[in-house]
């Protein structure tokens, strides 16, 4: 089992590949999933929640905004080096309003429930 990756290529399998984003999940560990999302310029993730699941976002490339809390929460800026903690069940969305694609990695426990 490979244990070391770069922050721009976490390995794993493609979960979604469409005109909004490319998502890959690495399920090499028993209790955590590491997911990588390339969010294309001008696009946004669908806002969602994970009841019973916390999540950590680590932004690697590109600039944009993120909303955490509820759909009406004020967006805040994110970019390379930003780390965002998503509490259990909190609404969250990433918005790429920058001039290039964004890349961010997420870590969450258990299985993907979204």
Language-model features: where?
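Ligand-binding loop in jelly-roll beta-barrel domains
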Residues: 79-80, 88-114
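A short, N-terminal "cap"/entry segment at the start of jelly-roll beta-barrel domains
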Residues: 1-33, 46
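Conserved short histidine dyad/triad with adjacent acidic residue
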Residues: 35-51
């Amino acid at each position: 089992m490979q244990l070391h990756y770069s922050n721009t290529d976490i390995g794993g399998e493609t979960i979604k590949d469409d005109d909004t984003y490319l998502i890959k999940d690495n399920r090499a560990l028993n209790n955590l999933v590491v997911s990588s999302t390339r969010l294309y310029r001008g696009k946004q993730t669908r806002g969602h929640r994970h009841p019973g699941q916390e999540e950590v976002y680590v932004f690697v490339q590109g600039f944009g905004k993120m909303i955490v809390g509820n759909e009406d929460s004020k967006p805040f800026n994110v970019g390379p080096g930003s780390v965002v903690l998503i509490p259990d069940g909190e609404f969250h969305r990433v918005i790429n309003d920058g001039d290039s694609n964004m890349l961010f990695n997420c870590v969450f426990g258990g299985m993907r429930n979204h």
